[in-house]
Amino acid sequence: VDPLRKLDYNIISIDAPAHGNSDGSLFTAVKYSRIIKTTIELYEPQIVIAHSVGALATIFQESSNRHDFIEKFVFLGSPNRLEVIMCGYHSLLSFNNSVYESLNKLLKNKFGFYIEDFNASEFAKKIDVPSLIVHHPDDLIVPFEAMGEIAATMPQATTYSSQTGGHSLYTQEVIDQVIQFSEKP
């Protein structure tokens, strides 16, 4: 944020529900996408920068709510398939298949999607503005392949494979790439 502020950008930043300084105990990408949509419509940014599940949620909301005032997107460490994330949690938390299936049904009933249907690469097909997708090959949270899967379907995507930063991608190298992309006409 500070490097962009020094370049005189106006910054609007939000934390996901149940993350950082936000209230709540429930987080879903769909719930987050609604907050992102509201924020975008309130402030009308020209450039949107989103990280991790925030990037997935931004891609999802923009696929059905095209905002013509947005000129560019930057997606940092975005997951592609919710199924990959959920399988990781399934393994990490050692919950059984019936818990996974119950969660899958809950998501379908509450948000209209099964886990396997929630894919950024599918939603990204509808985003036709210049977009920078950045990922680190050794990201331990989100598979590196997600970058290529999303970019392959996004008409104006540019990818950048970071050599630093892991999943957070908070390094000077990435900051420089984001600034260079943002400043490009």
Short names for language-model regions:
Residues A120, V129, P143-A152, V174:
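Short alpha-helix in the alpha/beta-hydrolase fold that links the catalytic acid
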Residues K126-D128, I133-H135, D139:
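Short beta-strand/loop motif that positions the catalytic acidic residue
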Residues I49-T58:
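Gly/Ala-rich beta-loop-alpha elbow adjacent to hydrolase catalytic centers
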Residues G165-I175:
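Catalytic histidine-centered segment of alpha/beta-hydrolase-like enzymes
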Residues V1-N21:
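Conserved alpha/beta-hydrolase
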Residues P137-V142, H167-S168:
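Acidic catalytic loop of the alpha/beta-hydrolase fold
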Residues G24-P45:
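Alpha/beta-hydrolase active-site loop
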Residues N65-F111:
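Hydrolase active-site cap/lid region
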